[in-house]
Amino acid sequence: MRRLFTSESVTEGHPDKICDQISDAILDEILKKDPYARVACETAVTTGLVLVMGEITTECYVDIPRIARDVIRDIGYTRAKYGFDADTCAVITSIDEQSPDIAMGVNKALEARRGELTDAEIEAIGAGDQGLMIGFACDETEELMPMPIMLAHKLARRLAEVRKNGTLSYLRPDGKTQVTVEYEEDRPVRVDSVVVSAQHAPEVDHDTIEKDIIEHVVNVIIPENMMDKNTKIFVNPTGRFVLGGPQADSGLTGRKIIVDTYGGYARHGGGAFSGKDPTKVDRSASYAARYVAKNIVAAGLAKKCEVQVAYAIGVATPLEVEINTFGTGKISDEKISEIVKKVFDLRPAAIIRDLDLRRPIYRQVAAYGHFGRHDLDLPWEKTDRVDILRKLAGI
C-alpha cells in the first residue's frame, strides 16, 4: 500500500524560532552561572519589539536585553530595512520568581548539596508538572528519525547556510520548508513534493530565486535517488516573499513543537521545550523518551518505537512507561517495557543526572530540531544502552 506523509520545518529567522532561540539563550546564560536555577522563560516578538517574560529563580544576574539582541544579530536581522533589527528593536522584560507552590514539589531533596544524590533523594525530587511526554525513533534514516522531518530540517538549514556564506546573498532570514515523502509498505520510496519559501530582497525576480534555490538548496539536500520526473518542487509559490520575520508575523516561544520533534510522524504530549530548565519534565522527559526509543531501535529490538511517559506534579516515579513498536518488535511490547524499566531510570532527577542536563546546551537545538542532530553531541542521541538492551532481550 502506498501513502504520502508530509513534514515541515522553519529557518532560524522565522518569528517563532527567534523566540525559541532567545528563550534558550537566556536559559544557557543562566545555567553557565547557576546550574540549579529554575527557569521558565517565554519570548514574544513583533515589529520592533521583543518581550521576555516568565518565572526565573536564580542566584545570578544575566543581561537579558543584551542576550536577546545577540541572538537576533546572529540570526541575521542586522538592518533596519528588514523591519526588525538587533540594534533598534525595543526589549522589554517582565520576570517573576517561580511559584513556591511548584517549587515545594521539586525542592524536597537535598538538591542544593551539589553532590551525588542517593536513591532516596532522587525519589524525593518530584516532577515539576503533570503531563505526558513522547519519544520516538525509526530506522528510516541514519539519524533514526522519520525521513520527512529530517529532509525538511536539512533544507531549512541549507537555506540559512547559503544566505550566510554569500552563495545567495539576496536571501533574508525568514523561511519555511516542507517535504512530502511517498511510502510503500511503510518504507520511504520517493520524495513526492518539496516546498521552499525563502524571504528575499525586493529587487530579485522570481525566476532567479526559483532556479537558484533548486540548484543550491533542493538538489544539494534531497537525495537524487529519491526524486524522479514526477517530483513537484515549489519555490515561493505565492511569487513573492519580501515582507517577513517579526515585521510580517508576530512570534512566540513554543509554537513550533511539531517542528521541534518528529514532524507529526509521532504523537506529541503538548509541552514545548525552549526556555525551560531540566526540572521541567516537558523538556527533560521528552529527551529521555527519545533516548529510550533511539536505543531500542539502534539495538534492533524494533524498526519503529514510540515511548510514552506520564508524571504527576511532585511525584518522582512515572505514572506510566508505555512502549509501542507498531508491530515491528522482535519481542513483545510488554517485554520491551519491562526491560526499559530495568535499564532506564525515568525519575526526573535521574534523567537530569544520567543525561547531564544542567549544562548550557539548549540554544543550539532551538532551531532545526531537538532530535536526530548528528551535527551536535547531544546526550539523548547517544546509543550507549544498546548492548544491555540486546542482552536482556536475548537477541
Curated annotation (Swiss-Prot):
Keyword ATP-binding: yes
Record note on cofactor: Binds 2 divalent ions per subunit.
Group of enzyme by EC: transferase
Family membership noted in the UniProt record: Belongs to the AdoMet synthase family.
Residues at which ATP binds: H14, D174, G175, K176, R240, F241, D249, R255, K256, A272, K276
Pathway(s) served: Amino-acid biosynthesis; S-adenosyl-L-methionine biosynthesis; S-adenosyl-L-methionine from L-methionine: step 1/1
Annotated gene: metK
One GO cellular component, as annotated: cytoplasm
Protein name (database record): S-adenosylmethionine synthase
A Pfam family recorded for this sequence: S-AdoMet_synt_N
Disulfide bond positions: none
Region (Flexible loop): 98-108
Entry's localization field: Cytoplasm
Keyword Cytoplasm: yes
Residues annotated to bind Mg(2+): D16
Matching InterPro entries: ADOMET_SYNTHASE_CS (IPR022631), S-AdoMet_synt_C (IPR022630), S-AdoMet_synt_central (IPR022629), S-AdoMet_synt_N (IPR022628), S-AdoMet_synthetase (IPR002133), S-AdoMet_synthetase_sfam (IPR022636)
Protein keywords: ATP-binding, Cytoplasm, Magnesium, Metal-binding, Nucleotide-binding, One-carbon metabolism, Potassium, Transferase
